Design a protein with these regions (language model features):
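Polytopic transmembrane helical bundles with strong interfacial aromatic enrichment
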Residues: 1-158
Length: 158
């Protein structure tokens, strides 16, 4: 029962993080194009600030639930006197998670700080440049997230 609970929250974390990136790229950003640069950059800054917080919570949930599920599987194998051989799709999830986490941290620490400074100083071209960099890295993370979803579903063990 605990494993099923952890898996449900793990999947919820995936939905929030991947879905949030898709929403930002394919819905909010294109809709914001009708706004003048000061309003557009200010709106995207406010949305990114909220999204980065929500995504950080989703990432923490993913990590805690994923690590707990691996630990439970390892513990069950040990109790049964078996060697624990983690499936390839689990390794893929873990490796992709850490790559995506590094990209997320880079967005938050580098690009969002540039965006925040640009909005504070009302330097709209600088804000637009920071948003372009964020868009590129969010696109990378979205592709990685979709890849791992397909890989895991086709692998069939997760």
């Amino acid at each position: 029962m605990l494993y099923a609970f952890l898996k449900a929250f793990h999947l919820l974390g995936v939905v929030v993080w991947i879905g949030g990136m898709a929403f930002m790229l394919f819905c909010l950003r294109p809709a914001a194009r009708v706004l003048e640069p000061p309003a557009r950059v200010t709106l995207m800054h406010a949305a990114m600030k909220r999204f980065l917080t929500v995504a950080a919570v989703a990432i923490a949930v993913l990590f805690v639930c994923g690590a707990s599920m691996v630990g439970m599987a390892w513990s069950a194998a040990a109790r049964a006197g078996l060697a624990f051989n983690m499936p390839l799709d689990w390794y893929t999830m873990i490796a992709t998670f850490f790559v995506m986490l590094a990209v997320f941290i880079h967005i938050r620490v580098v690009h969002f700080r540039r965006l925040d400074a640009a909005v504070t100083a009302a330097k709209w071209p600088d804000g637009a440049a920071a948003l372009a960099a964020i868009r590129w890295e969010v696109s990378i993370n979205l592709v990685l997230g979709i890849f791992v979803i397909f890989f895991v579903r086709l692998g069939g063990t997760a």
